[in-house]
C-alpha cells in the first residue's frame, strides 16, 4: 500500500507518503494562495526522493475543508485526478476532525475555524472515540457560539471569542500534518470518488475594477 495524503485547507500546505509500515515521508511549507502552482510539484519531488512511481500509489487522502476556498479546491482536484488516473479510492478528511483528533476518546471539545465576515465553522465532538466524518460542522455567527468546556481554534479567532466564552478552557491547535490526514483516512469507513468539498463559508471575492 502507498497512500498519498494532501492538506491544502490553510495557508500551510503539505503532502505525505504512507506505506504498510507507517509514514514514509512528508513535507510542509507556507504556500499562501499559491497552492495551484506548488502542491503537485512538491508531491512529485517527494515521490522522486522516495523512489515511488505514481502508478504504485494505491490510495489518496485529502483534507476537504472547511478552510481556504482556493486551497481546498486545488487539493481535491489533485486527489480526484490521482484517483481517476490510477483507478484507486480517495478518502475525504474533515479539517475540523484534524483539530479535534488529539482529544478523541478523552473529553469533549468544540473546534472552530474562521470563515470570515463574522462567521465560523463550528463542530462539537463528544468524549467518546468518535469515528471520522461523523461530526457535522455548522456555519455559525461568532456572537452565537455557545460556551464549551474545552475549545480549540487558532489564537486570532480565540481573541474574538474569549470575551463571550468566559471560563472555557482554550487549547491552541496542535501542529496538523499531512501524516495526520493519512492516519485519519486509514480509520475512515468510506472512500469517495470524486471527493466533494466542505466550504460552509462564502468565497473570497476579488476587488472591483476601478
Which residues does each PLM region occupy?
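N-terminal beta-alpha supersecondary unit
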Residues: 1-64
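Oxyanion-binding and handling regions
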Residues: 1-22, 34, 91-210
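Residues at secondary-structure transition points
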Residues: 30-38, 69, 73, 77, ...
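Short amphipathic alpha-helical face segments that pack within enzyme cores
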Residues: 38-41, 77, 81, 98, ...
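Short glycine/serine- and small hydrophobic-enriched flexible loop segments
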Residues: 44-45, 84, 183-184
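DPxDG-like acidic metal-binding loop motif
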Residues: 59-90
Amino acid at each position: 500500500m502507498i497512500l498519498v495524503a494532501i492538506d491544502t485547507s490553510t495557508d500551510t500546505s503539505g503532502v505525505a507518503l504512507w506505506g504498510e509500515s507507517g509514514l514514509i515521508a512528508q513535507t510542509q511549507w507556507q504556500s499562501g494562495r499559491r497552492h495551484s502552482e506548488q502542491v503537485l510539484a512538491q508531491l512529485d519531488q517527494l515521490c522522486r526522493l522516495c523512489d515511488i512511481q505514481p502508478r504504485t500509489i494505491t490510495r489518496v487522502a485529502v483534507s476537504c475543508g472547511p478552510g481556504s476556498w482556493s486551497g481546498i479546491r486545488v487539493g481535491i482536484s489533485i486527489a480526484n485526478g490521482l484517483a481517476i488516473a490510477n483507478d484507486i479510492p480517495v478518502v475525504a478528511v474533515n479539517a475540523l476532525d484534524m483539530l479535534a483528533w488529539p482529544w478523541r476518546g478523552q473529553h469533549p471539545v468544540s473546534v472552530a475555524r474562521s470563515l470570515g465576515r463574522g462567521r465560523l465553522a463550528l463542530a462539537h465532538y463528544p468524549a467518546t472515540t468518535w469515528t471520522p466524518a461523523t461530526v457535522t460542522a455548522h456555519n455559525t455567527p461568532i456572537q452565537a457560539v455557545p460556551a464549551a468546556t474545552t475549545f480549540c481554534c487558532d489564537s486570532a479567532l480565540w481573541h474574538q471569542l474569549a470575551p463571550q466564552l468566559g471560563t472555557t478552557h482554550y487549547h491552541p491547535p496542535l501542529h496538523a500534518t499531512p501524516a495526520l490526514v493519512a492516519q485519519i483516512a486509514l480509520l475512515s469507513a468510506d472512500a469517495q470518488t470524486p471527493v466533494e468539498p466542505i466550504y460552509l463559508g462564502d468565497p473570497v471575492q476579488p476587488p472591483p475594477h476601478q
